């Protein structure tokens, strides 16, 4: 008597799709069981107090700790960062007040009135009954006149500083003053972090100093409108990686940020008061010769209440062609990328995002 064996087909792979390098068909398989690989299951908290130390050995040790996280996770909470909690609270308070204004008042700073698309933008999502507000964004950028280290610039270099075309509420000078104060504090922190990254990658800690005299900076006051937790579309910002050098995120206590690990699983970055979330961007991965990782992430607002966040995107001077760091190359590991002018790089990335990203110009421009 013969028997017939039943062949069970393996399950079809499941994937998470994300936006990167101008395309939306990037994917990562969701790995479970025997297919799972070692990866992070939480976002680490790093105490960066010693990056400000006068002792080089303490700065070096802190840089090694930061670099290890940037190589394995690409995301971290940072504490003891030196930015006043009172200022952070004031910025959030003003952001809430700004977004609570009538739409016609906010549209006085419509992004399309600015040649560099700085100002206010609103995003909608489809609902069974039509459209609803998904989120609102107020964007402003680096203005050299408000840098604690005011640079000497040629007219051509100044024109590359898109913040010279920032739009501000005319009848609310305190708003502008507070946001520029916040920008100044984060510029100090960003330059310190960049020295830490350089040291952690084996370079001189001042390696990047000459090319962040007039950096590309973009700051966005985000308001995610309340959503029905049962709604199909809960993405406040779809899966993507940041194309700048790095991001410092200031999030409220509602939560919603999720980080994609190597197994294709999203890990929540739950808010921790007194910290910022810092993540590696595509350009930093590029110039580190892929030693640092720019990790995919998304925002989902399933809370049913208003959510606010303030990402601060930081990159180098726009007119400099930045090469892969010599400290990240060797005879056996040559540079994988050609030097790239950041102005050209970001312009191309914006163009691709503008053409393909469903969430509009804010997500294209960062």
Enumerate the language-model features and the residues they cover.
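Peripheral, non-catalytic segments flanking oxidoreductase cores
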Residues: 1-366
């Amino acid at each position: 008597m013969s028997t017939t064996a039943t062949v069970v087909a393996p399950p079809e792979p499941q994937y998470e799709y994300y936006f990167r390098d101008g395309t939306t068909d990037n994917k990562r398989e969701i790995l479970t069981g025997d297919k799972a690989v070692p990866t992070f299951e939480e976002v680490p908290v790093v105490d960066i107090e010693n990056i400000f130390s006068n002792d080089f050995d303490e700065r070096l040790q802190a840089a090694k700790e930061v670099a290890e996280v940037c190589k394995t996770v690409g995301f971290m909470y940072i504490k003891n960062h030196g930015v006043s909690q009172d200022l952070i609270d004031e910025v959030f308070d003003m952001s809430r007040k700004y977004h609570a204004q009538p739409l016609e008042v906010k549209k006085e700073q419509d992004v399309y009135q600015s040649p560099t698309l700085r100002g206010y933008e609103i995003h909608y999502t489809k609902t069974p009954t039509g459209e609803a507000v998904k989120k609102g964004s107020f964007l402003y950028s680096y203005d050299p006149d408000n840098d604690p280290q005011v640079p000497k610039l040629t007219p051509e270099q100044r024109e590359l500083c898109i913040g010279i075309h920032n739009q501000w509420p005319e009848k609310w000078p305190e708003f502008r003053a507070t946001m520029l104060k916040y920008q100044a504090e984060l510029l100090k922190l960003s330059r310190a972090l960049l020295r830490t990254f350089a040291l952690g990658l084996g370079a001189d800690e001042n390696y990047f100093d000459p090319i962040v005299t007039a950096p590309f900076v973009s700051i966005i006051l985000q308001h995610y409108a309340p959503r029905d937790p049962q709604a199909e579309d809960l993405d406040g910002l779809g899966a993507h990686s940041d194309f700048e050098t790095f991001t410092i995120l200031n999030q409220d206590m509602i939560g919603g940020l999720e980080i994609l690990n190597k197994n294709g699983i999203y890990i929540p970055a739950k808010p921790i008061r007194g910290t910022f979330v810092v993540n590696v961007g595509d350009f930093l991965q590029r110039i580190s010769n892929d030693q640092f990782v720019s990790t995919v992430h998304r925002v989902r607002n399933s809370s049913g209440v208003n959510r606010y966040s303030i990402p601060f995107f930081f990159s180098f001077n726009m007119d400099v062609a930045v090469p892969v760091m010599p400290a990240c190359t060797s005879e056996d590991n040559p540079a994988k990328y050609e030097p790239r002018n950041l102005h050209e790089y970001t312009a191309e990335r914006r163009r691709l995002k503008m053409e393909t990203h469903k969430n509009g110009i804010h997500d294209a421009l960062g």
